[in-house]
Design a protein with these regions (language model features):
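N-terminal metal-binding scaffold of metallo-dependent hydrolase/deaminase domains
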Residues: 1-38, 386
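Conserved, mostly hydrophobic/aromatic
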Residues: 48, 128, 183, 213, ...
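Divalent metal-dependent hydrolysis catalytic cores, especially in the metallo-beta-lactamase
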Residues: 61, 77-106, 121-134, 161-172, ...
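Active-site gating loops and adjacent loop-to-helix segments of metal-dependent hydrolytic enzymes
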Residues: 81-92, 135-161, 204-244, 284-318
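Metal-dependent enolase-superfamily TIM-barrel catalytic cores that perform enediolate-based chemistry
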Residues: 107-129, 136-197
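Active-site core of metal-dependent hydrolases
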Residues: 159-285
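His/Asp/Glu-enriched, well-ordered alpha-helical/loop segment
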Residues: 230-246, 263-275, 281-369, 373-376
Length: 392
C-alpha cells in the first residue's frame, strides 16, 4: 500500500518545508516531492501539523507498571506500546545495576519479546546502565551490586548477550579503561556515567573508547574545590572533548539555563535527549520498585517527580519523549516561542540518537529511510504515529 503524507510542515534534514508530499511504500520512505506531483495512494493530511521522524529513546527503563528487569515479555511489550503513543518509535531498553541472574532473565525476556513487538516502539538493542559505577555516585542504583569492570566481570556479559549496544560505566574505577577499549573493539558504545572522575580521567577515557556521557550533570562530578584550588570534573570534560551528551530534558533534572548551555556549547548534533523513564511512568504518585520486582529498590513519586525514599535525590524520571522535545524546544527558543525551538529539539530526539546507535535508516525523513513518522502540533501533542508505515 502507498501512503502519501501531505499538508504538513515537514521536518527534513535541511529544515522545515511545506508544500510537499512524502510517499511511503513497503514500509520505507520512497520519495519526497512537490505536493502537486503526489501519486495515488492513501492520503494522510497533516492539517498543518509537523511531520517528523519518530523519536528515538536511547535510555529508558520501562513504564506503566513495568521495569525491563522484571524479566517478563509483557515488561517489554507494554512500555513499548505506551511510549509509542507519545511519539517513540525506537528505543534501547536499559537495565540498571542488578544481579547477573536478573540480567539473564531480562535479556531472555527481551529475546522473546522481539518477534511479538508489533504495536510498540521497536527495540534497538540493550543498554546496560551498570554495574560498573563509582559507589560515591551510585545515585538511585543499588550500590551493593556494583562490580569492578574487570574482564572476569564484563566478558561473560559481552559473550552471552550480543544484544548489548551500550554500557555505561565510571572511568575512574579499576579496569574501566580496558572496558572502554574492549567495547570500542566490539562496536559497542562506551558511556561515562555515575562517576566522580576528574576531567583528566574522563579525557583519558575518551582516548580509550568512551564517546558518550550518560544523563549529563546527573550523578556526575563537576568543578570542585580542594584547599584553595579548583578542579574540573566529568561535566567539564564533556564540554572540552568531542563527547556526545545525553540529557534528561524533563524539566526536573536540569533547569532551562543548563539545557540552553548544553545546546549552545555542544550543538544539536552532539546532544541527545533521553527519558530515563522508570516503572512509574504513566502512573499516579505513590511508592514503587526500581529494578526487578523481586530484588529492586523502593522509590517514591511525589508531584510527578521520582525520588529516592530519603528524598535526597532523583530516581529516574516519569517523562515521555514528547515532553522532552517540548521542554527542550521551549528552553532553547526562549522569547521566540516553543515552536521556534522544535526543529533542533527534534534533531536531538531523532537524527542524533540514530547516528550514535548506528541506525542509518532511522531518525530522518529521507528516501530510503524507515517510515517511522509522527504528527504533532506546535505544543508537541502527538496525534498520529506510524512505525514502518503502519499506524499504531
Amino acid at each position: 500500500m502507498t501512503l502519501v503524507f501531505t499538508g504538513g510542515r515537514f521536518l527534513l534534514p535541511e529544515g522545515v518545508r511545506t508544500g510537499l508530499a512524502l510517499v511511503v511504500r513497503d514500509g520505507r520512505i520512497d520519495a519526497i516531492i512537490p505536493e502537486a506531483d503526489a501519486p495515488e495512494g492513501l492520503r494522510v493530511d497533516a492539517g498543518g501539523q509537523f511531520v517528523s521522524p519518530g523519536f528515538i529513546d536511547m535510555h529508558v527503563h520501562g513504564g506503566w507498571g513495568h521495569d525491563f528487569l522484571d524479566g517478563t515479555v509483557e515488561a517489554y511489550l507494554e512500555p513499548a506500546r505506551q511510549h509509542a503513543l507519545h511519539g517513540t518509535t525506537t528505543m534501547a531498553p536499559s537495565l540498571a545495576t542488578a544481579s547477573y541472574p536478573d540480567y539473564e532473565r531480562a535479556v531472555r525476556a527481551y529475546r522473546e519479546a522481539l518477534p511479538l513487538n508489533v504495536s510498540g516502539a521497536r527495540f534497538a538493542g540493550i543498554h546496560f546502565e551498570g554495574p560498573f559505577f563509582s559507589a560515591a555516585k551510585a545515585g538511585a542504583q543499588d550500590a551493593a551490586l556494583l562490580k569492578l569492570p574487570l574482564p572476569e566481570n564484563y566478558l561473560p556479559l559481552l559473550e552471552a548477550y550480543p544484544e548489548i549496544v551500550r554500557i555505561s560505566a565510571a572511568p575512574e574505577v579499576e579496569g574501566a579503561m580496558g572496558l572502554g577499549e574492549e567495547l570500542q573493539r566490539r562496536g559497542i558504545i562506551a558511556a561515562v556515567a555515575h562517576t566522580d572522575a576528574s576531567c583528566a580521567v574522563c579525557e583519558e577515557a575518551f582516548r580509550h573508547g568512551y564517546s558518550l556521557m550518560t544523563h549529563f550533570y546527573c550523578a556526575m562530578s563537576t568543578v570542585s574545590k580542594r584547599g584553595y584550588s579548583r578542579y574540573a570534573g566529568a561535566v567539564e570534560a564533556g564540554y572540552l572533548q568531542d563527547f556526545d551528551i545525553e540529557v534528561i530534558a524533563d524539566g526536573v533534572h536540569l533547569p532551562d539555563d543548563l539545557l540552553r548551555m548544553v545546546y549552545r556549547l555542544k550543538g544539536p548534533d552532539r546532544v541527545v535527549l533521553c527519558t530515563d523513564s522508570i516503572r512509574a511512568t504513566g502512573l499516579p504518585d505513590g511508592e514503587y520498585i526500581q529494578g526487578s520486582l523481586e530484588n529492586g529498590l523502593k522509590f517514591i513519586v511525589e508531584n510527578g517527580v521520582a525520588l529516592r525514599p530519603d528524598r535526597g535525590g532523583l530516581a529516574g524520571s516519569v517523562a515521555t519523549t514528547d515532553r522532552l522535545v517540548r521542554t527542550m524546544a521551549r528552553a532553547i527558543a526562549g522569547s521566540a516561542g516553543l515552536a521556534a525551538g522544535i526543529p533542533d529539539a527534534v534533531r536531538m530526539m531523532t537524527a542524533t540518537p540514530a547516528r550514535i546507535l548506528g541506525l542509518p535508516a532511522k531518525g530522518r525523513l529521507a528516501p530510503g529511510c524507515d517510515a517511522d513518522i509522527i504528527l504533532f502540533d506546535d505544543t508537541v501533542a502527538v496525534s498520529r504515529v506510524f512505525i514502518g508505515g503502519k499506524e499504531i
